[in-house]
Amino acid sequence: MEISLHENITNMKQFFTLVTIGALISSFTVFSSIDEVIAGMNKGNSTEIAKFFDNTVEINMPDKSNSYSKSQGELVLKDFFNSNSVKAFEIIHKGENSGSQYCIGTLLTKNGSFRTTIYMKKKGDKQVLQGITFEK
């Protein structure tokens, strides 16, 4: 059975289309968790962000730093956002390294801006938030 050149080219086009679609979907999946955390930062929404907390989360702020449980961490973050009403979150850099995701940005609030670092790590089949740092 002989395959014509035209059929061969058509099969190759279909193959590369599927590979490209697969790559796009997987790259979207990799960044979806951190993008949802960033969306929560933009709104100052501690509940949205806390959905991604690991069992314990490190939260560093200018006046206090500690490791918190999920529920404690959400309250600490909520308190921070209540004291520093969020205007916007501007991304400076976002990346991935060995399955971990990170984002460095500037959180703009009514009380000034905070250089913010978000660190997420792959745990099982999902990304969990392990640390947030706010620096004045």
Predicted region positions:
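Surface-exposed, charged secondary-structure patches
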Residues: 75-113
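A structural detector for beta-sheet-dominated domains
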Residues: 60-62, 92, 121, 135
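Short beta-strand edge/turn micro-motifs at domain boundaries
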Residues: 113-136
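Short, aromatic-enriched amphipathic alpha-helices that serve as compact interaction elements
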Residues: 30-45
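Bacterial Sec-dependent N-terminal signal peptides
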Residues: 1-34
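Short solvent-exposed beta->alpha transition segments
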Residues: 53-88
